[in-house]
Amino acid sequence: MRLATFNVFSGRSLADGQVVPARLTEAVRAIDADVLGIQEVDRDQPRSGGVDMTAAVAVAMGVPDGQWRFEPALLGTPGERWTAVPDGAGPAAGPAAGPAQGPAYGVGLLSRLPVLDWHAVPLASAPVASPVLVPSERREGRPRALWLPDEPRVALAAVLATAVGALTVATTHLSFVPGWNVVQLRRLLGALRELPQPVVLLGDLNLPGPVARIAAPGWRPLARVATWPATRPRVQFDHVLGHGDLPAVEAVSTPELPVSDHRAVVVQFAG
């Protein structure tokens, strides 16, 4: 069983800053995961050609209807005009959710294994702004800092049927505000403990490796690898955390892909 997390950076490439759908398809096929959590996902955004990125990833993976979902963190365009997702809105995309209702931004979860149930966990934005590092416009340039207000976040979890029983897999993209991302992580981990065990959390936690491990007592880091920036990774922001009785990890990889400023993290389980 092969699980992966990938911050898709709205489908953009660092090479030229362009969004080319074929590149995202190439990246997803290279990852070749049985279960994939994706972050910074656009739906119906002009900046990424108006595509439903989660649906495009589902096609690239060969995931059937009912086994993928997009969960919006916000409606509108991040960094521009947006509104919070209404309480109780539920998954905003996926074959069972009806037509898209305008631009949205969030996370997606896709599984080649049968999905038994879906759960979403909203995570409130920080009350303060914070500096955030963004990639340089030049491929080998140094990252630059921008002062940005925070935005709502969300986690999406699926209970999967595997050969050895139920497995819950979740994905999220936490706040860049120091400390607030720890608050969000602890709230999320508490919610995930209430779901069928074992659990694997896939995501961009915006926390360096050692901080994430300290903030998640009782959870095992299944991959200790640098993931950012993609061209020359020095920091681990993208994590795979496990809770409960999981198979042994056989291999971990961080392939360099034609899209994103992050490396994907791919974990291969035994069996």
Model regions: which residues?
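Short, P/G- and charge-enriched loop/turn segments at secondary-structure junctions
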Residues: 84-100, 142-147, 225-229, 252-256
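N-terminal, active-site-proximal structural segment of metallo-dependent hydrolase catalytic domains
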Residues: 1-104, 167, 182-187
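Short, solvent-exposed aromatic-acidic interface loops
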Residues: 75-76, 122-128, 174-176, 255-259
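Residues that flank catalytic or metal-binding motifs in active/ligand-binding sites
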Residues: 103-106, 152-156, 165, 235-237, ...
